[in-house]
Amino acid sequence: MAANNYTKKAVHFGAGNIGRGFVACFLHNSGYEVIFADVNADLINALNASPSYKVIEVGSEGTEESTITNYRAINSRTNEEELIQEIATAEVVTCSVGPNILKFIAPVIAKGIDRRSEDLPPVAVIACENAIGATDTLAEYIKDPKNTPSHRLENYEKRARFANSAIDRIVPAQDADAGLDVKLEKFYEWVVDRTPFKDMSPPDIKGINWVDNLLPYIERKLYTVNTGHATAAYHGYIRRKSTVYDALQDKDIQEEVKKALENTSHLITQKHGIDEQAQHEYVEKIVRRISNPHLEDAVERVGRAPLRKLSRKERFIGPAAELAEHGKDCSALLDAAEMAFRFQNVEGDEESAELAKIMASNKPEDVVKQVCGLNEQEKLFPKVVEVVQRVQADLHDD
């Protein structure tokens, strides 16, 4: 059997729009062969049947297309052994599966790392999720005794390095006939923690901004882009707007988004020492981005998974809890959270149905503990209880 020409190899979990359009695109442009891992058999078959797909970047100044090649796809449900071998010989493992799915991909990654030859440099594991510390979370699952025997954790850094990251790119719902092609905005930011690679070079991936202190980037992104996007979507849904763009044409919703981002900007500038003018300009840029008419993003898509988005470290409760502890204004974040609590029984969104059940069958205090992860000692707790009481009262009136 003829030897392949050596190319760098990356395994990416999650062959959805962000995986194909953002992460794999960067890996491809940096000279990696990309191995997609997914449980969607139709998607895996389509990728293996097609030698290429297009990534279409849209912006106010027009569109740009690039072609992605040099990839394969593996069904992680049915071809685990093949996937383990690919991980054991890859330079990089990335994922964009959603924070709730990390625990399901951890066992196979653990097996791949465990099989890795000591002659190879450590594999770089980078989770590309909208969550603070997602790679740390994935690493905890991987190192769990169920997935990695405790005696195999000795010198683990010789086999794997785990780097947290912050990703920022809006990938809207795709056209029904798009196939494998992905449309997304031109703007991107991918910031990764350099500190796990102090004694070695980090992976050579063009477009990554390697930093020594990631938290300011993660919180600035989550509490500006995701807070702003979701605020527009939830207020828009309640006011029967169809897209985020439509919502932001409404002056009242525009004002709600502006006020929510004033709340979070206060936290970001005070906590991380970010210049107020720089944060103001960042906010202006973000509002322009989420107002992009070329990204026809339905409010139902942006608002989906309200239970996750109302959780303790997420875009509303996370910043509001810190602001409340310091006696600072978080009223616009509470208003946005109220709209998220009203996002119930939305077609195609399981979490919105689950939220409706929780709201219908629990006392307000228990809802806040269960959904938001807050305890009674926190200053935000009674404020969110009031929000839940209001929503429940309206539901009883209907």
Curated annotation (Swiss-Prot):
InterPro entries: 6-PGluconate_DH-like_C_sf, 6PGD_dom2, Mannitol_1_phos_5_DH, Mannitol_DH, Mannitol_DH_C, Mannitol_DH_N, NAD(P)-bd_dom_sf. It catalyses: D-mannitol 1-phosphate + NAD(+) = beta-D-fructose 6-phosphate + NADH + H(+). Keywords: NAD, Oxidoreductase. SUPFAM superfamilies: 6-phosphogluconate dehydrogenase C-terminal domain-like, NAD(P)-binding Rossmann-fold domains. GO terms for biological process: mannitol catabolic process. The active site is at K221. Its EC number is 1.1.1.17. GO terms for cellular component: cytosol. GO terms for molecular function: mannitol-1-phosphate 5-dehydrogenase activity. It is an enzyme of class 1 (oxidoreductase). Monomer. PANTHER family: ALTRONATE OXIDOREDUCTASE-RELATED (PTHR30524:SF0), MANNITOL-1-PHOSPHATE 5-DEHYDROGENASE (PTHR30524). Belongs to the mannitol dehydrogenase family. HAMAP family: Mannitol_dehydrog. This is Mannitol-1-phosphate 5-dehydrogenase. It comes from Neurospora crassa (strain ATCC 24698 / 74-OR23-1A / CBS 708.71 / DSM 1257 / FGSC 987).
